[in-house]
Amino acid sequence: MRNKERNFPNQNNNKFEGEPRAKAEYASKRANGTTNTHPQERMHASGKRDDNF
C-alpha cells in the first residue's frame, strides 16, 4: 500500500501540482541546444531562489 492511499501527510511540504520549479534562466542548456555560460554563477543563483517549494 502506498503512502498516498493511507492518507499520510505531506511531511516535506513538497509541491506536486502547478508549474515546475525548473526555470530556463538556471538551465544548463539553452533552447537551441548550446551550453549556457557561467555555470558556477548560474548554480549559485539557483540555490538562492525564494520559491523553495
UniProtKB/Swiss-Prot annotation:
Q: Briefly describe its induction.
A: Expressed only in the forespore compartment of sporulating cells.
Record's keyword annotation contains Ligase: no
This protein's record includes keyword Membrane = no
What cellular component terms from Gene Ontology apply here? endospore-forming forespore
Record InterPro entries:
SASP_SspK
Q: Could you tell me the keywords of this UniProt record?
A: Sporulation
Biased-composition ranges for Basic and acidic residues? 16-28, 39-53
Entries under Pfam families matching the protein: SspK
Which parts of the sequence are annotated with region: Disordered?
1-53
Q: State its location(s).
A: Spore core
Report which superkingdom the organism of origin falls in. Answer: Bacteria
For biological process, the GO terms are:
asexual sporulation; sporulation resulting in formation of a cellular spore
Family from the record: Belongs to the SspK family.
Q: What is this protein called?
A: Small, acid-soluble spore protein K
Originating species: Geobacillus sp. (strain WCH70)
